[in-house]
Amino acid sequence: MEPLGNRRPCSVCITKNRNCPRFCEYAEYFPYELQSQYESANELFGTPNIITMMQHAPEEKKQMLATSIIMEGNAWTEDPISGGFGMIQKLMWKIMLHKAYLRELQEKIKEEKEKKPASSLY
């Protein structure tokens, strides 16, 4: 982690309205640049719960956890009814539509190949 002199306070310290220590353990995961996204996660989970989750996570999983917390907060901001599940449903629907479109294109290609005589293919 970098010294505070070279960075702004992290999102966790801003939310808790405290001075960000020189080597804050949350600065790496929730930097100042993610403040607006962190606010969404804070509304969903609350900073005390986020801190508890981060403290209990193994070191190698903390970055993944922080990313998941931010993404889940964003999902609920975007879709307050369904959250992350709603986003997954939308993505699955898009995949189904694209697969159907791909099948349609493959059938058209097959039809065009069948229309042309074999000698014109080369």
From Swiss-Prot:
Domain of life the protein comes from: Eukaryota
Domain LOB, first and last residues per copy: 8-109
Pfam families: LOB
Signal peptide: none
Database matches in PANTHER family: LOB DOMAIN-CONTAINING PROTEIN 4-RELATED, LOB DOMAIN-CONTAINING PROTEIN 5-RELATED
Family the entry assigns: Belongs to the LOB domain-containing protein family.
Protein name: LOB domain-containing protein 5
Organism: Arabidopsis thaliana (Mouse-ear cress)
Taxonomy of the source species: Eukaryota, Viridiplantae, Streptophyta, Embryophyta, Tracheophyta
Name of encoding gene: LBD5
